[in-house]
Amino acid sequence: MRFSAIVLTDHSPAVFLQMVRDVEAAGVERLWTYDHLSWRHFRDKPWFAAMPLLAAAAANTSRIRLGPLVATPNFRHPVPLAKEIMTLDQLTGGRIDLGVGAGADGPDATVLGDEKITGRQRADRFHDWVELLVTLLEQETVTATSGSYAAVDARMTPGAANGRGLR
């Protein structure tokens, strides 16, 4: 049996990192942290950004796999997200995982001023977002359009830590 753990980003960075080290010491295989700008009852409480905390976790661990859970098109464009994941993969020596989802209604969906969308629109947007994200993670240079998402001469160098595409 394999174990994964979730450590929320509602803790100070120092506490978050101690929890990450404790989870790794316990032999857990994978650690996720929620990739939200705020979350549920934590909306008016401290909540830190996932990607910088994952970078710090990479520097404080050596074995455990790390990743955001879940990244969504609610506030993430595929180009900067792919660059962040590629960078985290390099920082971890290939120990990065990426959880993705369509995104739900709520603060993450409206914080950038976007209109609420239907479930069908959300599914279509997710398809387009994943299509471009996967292309970016697999290729060194990308010029592509997928629905309302575009990448023009986007560079994903040096790519995956293991020399293969990030899949």
Predicted regions located by residue number:
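N-terminal beta1-alpha1-beta2 module of alpha/beta enzyme domains
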Residues: M1-N60, R164-L166
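Active-site beta-loop-alpha junctions enriched in small/polar residues
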Residues: I6-D10, H36, A71-P73, G101-D105
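Loop/helix-junction capping segments adjacent to catalytic residues or to phosphate/diphosphate-binding pockets
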Residues: P13-A14, F75-P78
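Conserved beta-strand positions in the central sheet of alpha/beta enzyme cores
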Residues: W32-T33, R65, G99
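Short, small-residue-enriched loops and turns at beta-alpha junctions
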Residues: W39-H41, P73-R76
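Internal, glycine-rich beta/alpha segment that forms the wall or movable "lid"
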Residues: R43, H77-R167
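Alpha-helix-loop-beta-strand connector modules within alpha/beta enzyme cores
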Residues: D44-G67, R125-L136
